């Protein structure tokens, strides 16, 4: 990978080990707080609907971190699914976890399991599929599916298991997440050459460009309050969404207005791949990575 002129790749410690810092940023007060730090690699925090814990992945497994008292990780029983990636989330009622795991087929498949733990239930027959967001009513979810090497956005009705294709092969389409009113799915797409933020109606009927920036914009997450979207931006010369780079964490209005850089951090892949807002929409969780000295 060619080094960026703005952001420089940093070296890691012995053996490439990293320190994960799970943090929370308040968009109203502009204050940050550290929840927990560890020498292990943790990724993609989801905030529980009751506001009590974060759900993250590490080494193929899921863990809960309490936001009250001792934040030491509690492993979730995911049954046979032991190669979970960072595309996971919690249903709006808190009863289900969605995971993306490749143990069964050697490719990422989407499963649902009780949030109390248990045997995962396969949802996607077409593979690979990477989960990214729940609909506000909890009746469907959206995901990135790769079919014949084409990246597109899909949704699935949970009861029927019917897969609906929402985008149609224009560039790479990835990272979808629902708006809180359930009318739009925000996603990132390279259809114009540079990865930017777009949105599509939940029935696929209309696609709109949201960002027009000089960066590679990834993983848009609309806030539950319906006024802001948080996302990660790489330098324009960075392909895909690698880890171990300085990236910008950006905030904007739902229509793409008032884009602002909140802060830079060392991370990228794993920082905020899946929904990460607090239930009230005032805060979001993310992971910052530090080289181990």
Swiss-Prot record:
InterPro entries registered for this protein in UniProt: 6-blade_b-propeller_TolB-like, PD40
UniProt protein name: Uncharacterized protein Atu1656
Family: Belongs to the TolB family.
Biological source species: Agrobacterium fabrum (strain C58 / ATCC 33970) (Agrobacterium tumefaciens (strain C58))
């Amino acid at each position: 990978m060619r080094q960026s002129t703005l952001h420089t790749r940093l070296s890691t410690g012995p053996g490439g080990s990293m320190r994960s810092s799970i943090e929370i940023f308040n968009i109203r007060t502009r204050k940050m707080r550290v929840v927990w730090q560890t020498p292990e690699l943790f990724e993609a925090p989801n905030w529980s609907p009751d506001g009590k814990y974060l759900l993250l992945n590490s080494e193929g497994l899921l863990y809960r971190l309490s936001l009250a008292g001792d934040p030491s990780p509690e492993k979730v029983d995911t049954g046979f699914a032991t190669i979970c990636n960072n595309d996971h989330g919690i249903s709006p009622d808190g009863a289900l976890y969605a995971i993306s795991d490749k143990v069964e087929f050697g490719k990422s498949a989407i499963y649902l399991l009780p949030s109390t733990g248990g045997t995962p239930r396969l949802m996607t027959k077409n593979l690979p599929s990477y989960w990214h967001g729940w609909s506000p009513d909890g009746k469907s979810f959206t995901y990135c599916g790769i079919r014949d090497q084409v990246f597109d956005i899909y949704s699935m009705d949970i009861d029927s298991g019917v897969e609906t294709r929402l985008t149609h092969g224009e560039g790479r389409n990835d990272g979808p997440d629902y708006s809180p009113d359930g009318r739009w799915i925000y996603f990132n797409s390279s259809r114009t050459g540079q990865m930017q933020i777009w949105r599509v109606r939940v029935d696929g009927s209309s696609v709109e460009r949201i960002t027009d920036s000089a960066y590679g914009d990834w993983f848009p997450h609309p806030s539950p309050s319906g006024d802001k979207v948080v996302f990660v931006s790489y330098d324009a010369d960075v392909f895909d969404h690698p880890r171990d780079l300085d990236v910008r964490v950006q905030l904007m209005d739902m229509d793409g207005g008032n884009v602002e850089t909140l802060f830079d951090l060392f991370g990228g892949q794993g920082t905020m791949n899946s929904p990460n807002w607090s239930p009230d929409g005032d805060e979001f969780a993310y992971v910052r990575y530090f080289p181990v000295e």
